[in-house]
C-alpha cells in the first residue's frame, strides 16, 4: 500500500497509509480541497460496504448475556424457522438421524420434550418471551449433551469451514469439543448438564472458627461460594444444531468505520452505520434453513445474537 506524501511546514513527510484510491491518508488537512477529501472518504465507504450487510436488514434478538446467549439465540432461530408449520418440523425431526440414534426406550419421551420446544409458539415474526426462551434454551443445551454422547467419534471437518486447516484432514466431534472448551469429554458431559444461564458457582457448607470478638474460638457453619466452570456455547454446539435441525449457520461480526482512522472496527452498538461482516459458516449450503447470528465482545465475554431478517 502506498503512503501519504503530504509534507508539513517542518518538511516532514506524513508516511501514513493512503486511503483506497487516494494519494493521501485519512487526515482532511492533507487534501488540497474539501471535494478531494469527500471523494476519498466516499470511496473508502463504498469499499467497506462491499461484502457486508447493512445492520438495518436484521432485527437483533437481544438475548441476555448470561453465558447461555448461544442457546437462547438458537431457540429464537428455531422459533423463526418453524413458523406455523409445526407438524412438518416434527415429521422432519422424527425422520432425522439424531432422533433415530436415540435408545428406543427414550424416543417417545424425547419427542414429547421436543414438542415442548414449540407448544407455546404463536407468531414467528416476534422473538420469544424470556420465560419460554429460557425453557427452550435449557432443552437445547441438554440436546447438545445427548448428541455428544452418541456422536463423539464422528468426523466434523466437512461440516465447518476451516476445521481442517487447524486440526488436519480429520477431526472428531470429541476433539473439537475438548480443544474449544479446554476440558475432557467426560467433564463436558457432566458440566453441561447444568444450564449455562444459571450461576457459575454453588454454595457449600463449611465449618469455620471465629477468630475475633466475644465469640472467638467458637466453631460455626457458614455457606461459602465454590466456583464452577462456565458452560457457554460456541462453534461445537452450533455444529451439533446444524445437524439436528438441518440448518446452515452464518456467523457475522458487527463493524463500522472508525471516524478517526477510517478503518473497520467492531461496533459496540448497532446503529445506522453498522454493517455485518461474515466470519464463519457452518454446514454451508447443506442445511434447508439458513440462520444468521451476530458475535461480538461484551463486558461478560463473547456474545451471540440471532439476526432475524426484516
Regions found by a protein language model. Name each.
Residues 40-60, 64-260:
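Papain-like cysteine protease catalytic cores
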Residues 24, 59, 70, 250, ...:
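Beta-strand cores of modular interaction/reader domains in eukaryotic scaffold and signaling proteins
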Residues 10, 28, 32-39, 268-281, ...:
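Asparagine-rich low-complexity intrinsically disordered tracts
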Residues 1-50:
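Intrinsically disordered, low-complexity regulatory regions of eukaryotic proteins
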Amino acid at each position: 500500500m502506498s503512503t501519504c506524501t503530504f509534507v508539513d511546514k517542518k518538511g516532514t513527510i506524513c508516511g501514513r497509509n493512503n486511503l483506497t484510491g487516494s494519494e493521501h491518508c485519512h487526515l482532511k488537512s492533507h487534501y488540497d480541497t474539501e471535494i478531494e477529501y469527500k471523494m476519498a472518504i466516499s470511496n473508502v465507504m463504498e469499499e467497506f460496504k462491499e461484502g457486508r450487510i447493512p445492520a438495518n436488514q436484521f432485527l437483533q434478538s437481544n438475548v441476555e448475556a448470561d453465558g447461555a446467549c448461544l442457546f437462547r439465540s438458537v431457540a429464537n432461530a428455531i422459533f423463526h424457522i418453524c413458523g406455523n408449520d409445526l407438524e412438518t418440523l416434527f415429521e422432519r425431526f422424527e425422520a432425522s438421524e439424531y432422533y433415530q440414534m436415540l435408545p428406543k426406550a427414550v424416543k417417545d419421551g424425547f419427542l414429547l420434550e421436543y414438542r415442548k420446544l414449540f407448544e407455546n409458539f404463536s407468531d414467528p415474526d416476534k422473538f420469544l418471551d424470556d420465560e419460554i426462551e429460557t425453557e427452550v434454551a435449557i432443552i437445547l443445551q441438554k440436546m447438545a449433551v445427548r448428541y455428544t454422547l452418541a456422536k463423539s467419534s464422528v468426523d466434523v471437518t466437512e461440516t465447518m469451514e476451516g476445521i481442517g486447516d487447524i486440526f488436519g484432514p480429520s477431526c472428531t466431534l470429541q476433539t473439537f469439543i475438548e480443544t474449544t472448551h479446554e476440558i475432557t469429554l467426560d467433564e463436558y458431559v457432566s458440566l453441561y448438564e447444568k444450564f449455562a444461564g444459571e450461576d457459575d458457582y454453588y454454595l457449600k457448607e463449611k465449618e469455620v472458627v471465629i477468630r475475633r470478638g466475644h465469640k472467638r474460638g467458637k466453631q460455626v457453619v457458614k455457606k461459602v461460594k465454590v466456583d464452577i466452570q462456565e458452560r457457554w456455547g460456541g462453534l461445537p454446539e452450533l455444529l451439533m444444531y446444524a445437524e439436528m435441525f438441518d440448518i446452515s449457520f452464518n456467523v457475522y461480526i458487527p463493524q463500522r468505520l472508525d471516524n478517526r482512522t477510517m478503518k473497520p472496527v467492531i461496533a459496540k452498538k448497532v446503529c445506522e452505520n453498522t454493517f455485518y461482516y461474515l466470519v464463519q459458516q457452518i454446514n454451508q449450503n447443506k442445511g434447508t434453513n439458513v440462520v444468521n447470528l451476530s458475535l461480538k465482545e461484551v463486558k461478560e465475554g463473547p456474545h451471540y445474537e440471532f439476526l432475524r431478517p426484516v
